[in-house]
Structure formats: C-alpha cells, structure tokens
C-alpha cells in the first residue's frame, strides 16, 4: 500500500481559470510544484491525483494550476485540502539529509555519557534551524536546536540519534 506525505495545503482560488493559492510545507517546493509533478488530495478515504500544469511564487505562497481544475467552481471545491506526495515520488536525499518520518520516534542519546535521553517526539520548523522535541521516558519533554554543535550523529540504519546537550537545554528539575 502506498504511503502519502503532506507537502502543502490549498488555501483559496486565485482568479477565474482554476489557479489556487498553496501554502507549501515541503523543503522542496520547486520540485514538488514543477510542471508535470503528481500530487494528491484526499477525498474521504481515497487519494485523487492532481498533475501540476504550472506554478509560480507569489509572496510567501505559490499560485498553482492543476490540469484537472479548469475553473473557479472546481478550485473552490479543493480549498482547505492538504496536498500529498506519494512515497514512490519522493526523491533520494543527499548524504546527511533525511525525511522527518525517518527520524521521528528514534531514540536520542547523550553523545558523551551514552545515556538515553528519550525519543524524538516532534519537529518544528520555526526559522533558520529546526527544533526537536525530546520526550524522556519519565519527566518533562525538552527542545533542542538541530545544529551541528548539538546534534552530533543521526544514524538511520540503527535508528539512533546522538546529541551534546548545551547548558540550559534540559531542565533537570
């Protein structure tokens, strides 16, 4: 069974010819929204394919034309729907890069002591660097920045993340 991953959301129609305004939530908007790209929306429990017929940046959004949508009435019907990419359409990432789905729930260890700190429970992308929520088995969750001085190693093969905690990142109380 094919898995699908969210890459954006259709916000509103734009004009009368079926263009829609899209908030892209992917690190690869130019690739995902390239002419001929396959994206999907979910209707009930089925995924419907949409083929990108054109896209351009507009402020912090993208204006996208899909082959299957040729008027404002059809565009209004897809507003509010998330856009997905099929797992089979995902590109191979460069060395040292990974999809969130591959590292979520990985155990996180202190690189110096080997102590298990918890699991990677959540990832937020607020700005220049992602921040990761580490959820210990007992106690309060804490957040770390995904920067070289903190995240030392991400071993996808062994599902293991090693970090060096800077002073103040973890509330010991």
UniProtKB/Swiss-Prot annotation:
Keywords associated with the record: Chaperone, Cytoplasm, Ribosome biogenesis, rRNA processing
What are the TM regions of this chain, as residue ranges?
none
This entry carries the following GO cellular component terms, namely: cytoplasm; ribosome
- Gene Ontology MF terms: ribosome binding
Give the record's GO biological process terms: ribosomal small subunit biogenesis; rRNA processing
- Gene3D superfamilies in alphabetical order: PRC-barrel domain, RimM
**Signal sequence, renumbered to the chain:** none
Where it sits in the cell: the answer is: Cytoplasm
Q: Which domain of life is it from?
A: Bacteria
* Residue span, PRC barrel domain: 95-169
Pfam families (alphabetical): PRC_RimM, RimM
- Function statement: An accessory protein needed during the final step in the assembly of 30S ribosomal subunit, possibly for assembly of the head region. Essential for efficient processing of 16S rRNA. May be needed both before and after RbfA during the maturation of 16S rRNA. It has affinity for free ribosomal 30S subunits but not for 70S ribosomes.
PANTHER family noted in UniProt: RIBOSOME MATURATION FACTOR RIMM
Q: What is known of its domains?
A: The PRC barrel domain binds ribosomal protein uS19.
Q: HAMAP family this protein is in?
A: Ribosome_mat_RimM
Q: Which family does it belong to?
A: Belongs to the RimM family.
- Subunit comment for this entry? Binds ribosomal protein uS19.
Protein name per its UniProtKB record: Ribosome maturation factor RimM
This chain's source organism reads: Lactobacillus gasseri (strain ATCC 33323 / DSM 20243 / BCRC 14619 / CIP 102991 / JCM 1131 / KCTC 3163 / NCIMB 11718 / NCTC 13722 / AM63)
Q: What is the lineage of its organism?
A: Bacteria, Bacillati, Bacillota, Bacilli, Lactobacillales
């Amino acid at each position: 069974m094919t898995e699908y991953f969210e890459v954006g959301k259709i916000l509103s129609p734009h004009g009368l010819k079926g263009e829609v305004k899209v908030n892209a939530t992917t690190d690869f908007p130019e690739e995902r929204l390239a002419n001929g790209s396959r994206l999907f929306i979910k209707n009930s429990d089925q995924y419907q394919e949409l083929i990108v017929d054109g896209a351009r940046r507009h402020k912090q959004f993208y204006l996208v034309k899909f082959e299957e949508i040729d008027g404002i009435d059809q565009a209004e019907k897809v507003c509010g729907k998330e856009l997905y990419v099929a797992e089979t359409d995902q590109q191979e990432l460069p060395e040292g890069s990974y999809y969130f789905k591959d590292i979520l729930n990985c155990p996180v260890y202190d690189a110096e002591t080997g102590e298990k700190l918890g699991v990677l429970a959540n990832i937020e992308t607020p700005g220049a660097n992602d921040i990761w929520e580490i959820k210990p088995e007992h106690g309060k969750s804490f957040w770390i920045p995904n920067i070289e001085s903190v995240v030392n190693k991400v071993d996808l093969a062994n599902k293991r993340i090693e970090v060096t905690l800077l002073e103040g990142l973890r509330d010991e109380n």
